[in-house]
Amino acid sequence: MLNEPNALLRRDANSTIATVTELFPNEYSNADIAYVLLSTVVVFTVTPGIALYYAGMVRKNSALSILTQSFLVTAVVFIQWYLFGYSLACSSGSSFYGTLWQGGMNHLWLEPYIPGSTIPAIVYFPFGGLFAVATAQLFAGAMAERGRLIPSLVISFLYITLVYCPQAYWTWAPNGWLYTLGALDFAGGGPVHISSGFAALAYSLCLGRRIVVDEPDRPDSIRSTDNADLPSSSQNNCKANWKRWFGFKSVSWKNSFGRGKIAHNPPHDAGMVYIGVVLIWFAWLCFNSGTLLTVNIRTAYIMTNTLISSSFGALTWAIIDYIRYRKFSTIGICEGAIAGLVGITPACGFVFPWGAAAGGIVPALVCNFLHDLNEWIGVDETLRVFNLHGIGGIVGSIVLGVVAHPDVAASDGATVIDGGWAVHHWKQMGYQFAGFTSVAAWSFVITAIICLLVDLVPGLHIRASFEEELRGMDFVELEEQLPGQTLESKPMIIYAQEMDEPVTQGSNIKQEKQDEF
């Protein structure tokens, strides 16, 4: 009776209560249901958290567009999750992909999330949807300061459909190929972090570099007020940016848009970054612990491990910065906490607290030393999503292959794993390697194809014009601006070729402070 589609909806209204009692399986746990629903509410704070974190990291004249994009990405992705995303990621299908059987929440009522689950699928539905939302928000931030809003929403919709949903299925579905292989990933080191990091790398390559402005000591800065000195429209598309990065296209702007120096715009509001990261940290406690979908001793291990790892990550980053510069950095400490959260996400349900410490220290060390990775590889990935989430997720998966312990997994009374190198299970690292390489490759290639195809659609070119980039995306795409800017203002400071003083371009342009840029 339970598996009969929409059985409850066909009952007479007078017998609804009796029917629910009849259909509600005895194995469902009210405590587990309550905890997953509570976790859903807490995890939702990751949406404003990522938005504030990213908005504080960009120039002021593009900050509000990042906030708006995060809001719209949440709406677009959750609609996708409702229409068919949940079904593709969670319904029983092949070893690679789910089916459309539960699209539109069809056949989704009191059925268990998976056979033997203590919660119904309807309880998991919003919780799992917020994982997809967080992943899309992380990767879509790569459009910062030069990407157009509407194409970014289209790309996010396609990314969740073609990248996140299959990878979530591989990782967590009972018959997903990575799950059956034996690769360990508790809460999304692959589908969430590695996937979003490599997708952000592909998106950034398609968008190309930001224009370097207001830096008179840089030879590749814009130093002329003549619009003719800006790159032509033929150089401002996805295909040309790929050719330029691979060295197949020689253009007069290659110093600015090919391999070499990239724009360095300092975060406009470190306080906004701090608030955003605190919200992310808070949400991640339930992001990880809620993934168990039940409440027991292992739940406590997971939450404790999350706090330990992020704390070690923040402190490690702070110590390295102080050794290098003899000063602490608010932004650096926040990035260290993020690195710790990324590192513990795949491992939180499989390691003892000492393993969680390693899961915070090692990713923070690696990500800090690779802080200039974008400069080395010639990619202008504005918010360092690839560094923190892509590289950090891989490092976290490797650490998991070393420190995974079967006793922690078994603390819920049901889970059995062989563990990692710490218990002499040498094959585990091979399984981890298969997991993060397949996720990284699939995410990078499919996202690049998505961006290339969307860019070819009339009206959906993914990058703003260079003139629009100079004005700021807030002025181009939004009715409102943050305090201190007006719709008539164009905060452009461009250094003239023969002058030491900044000049403004256009008759109605107000000169703004450099920190307003």
From Swiss-Prot:
Signal peptide region: none
Residue numbers on the Extracellular membrane side: 1-32, 91-118, 170-180, 294-299, 349, 406-432
Alphabetical list of InterPro entries matching this protein: Ammonium/urea_transptr, Ammonium_transpt, NH4_transpt_AmtB-like_dom
Cytoplasmic face residues: 54-69, 140-148, 202-272, 321-327, 371-384, 454-517
One biological process term in Gene Ontology: methylammonium transmembrane transport
Recorded family membership: Belongs to the ammonia transporter channel (TC 1.A.11.2) family.
Protein name: Ammonium transporter 3
Species whose genome carries this gene: Schizosaccharomyces pombe (strain 972 / ATCC 24843)
Lineage: Eukaryota, Fungi, Dikarya, Ascomycota, Taphrinomycotina
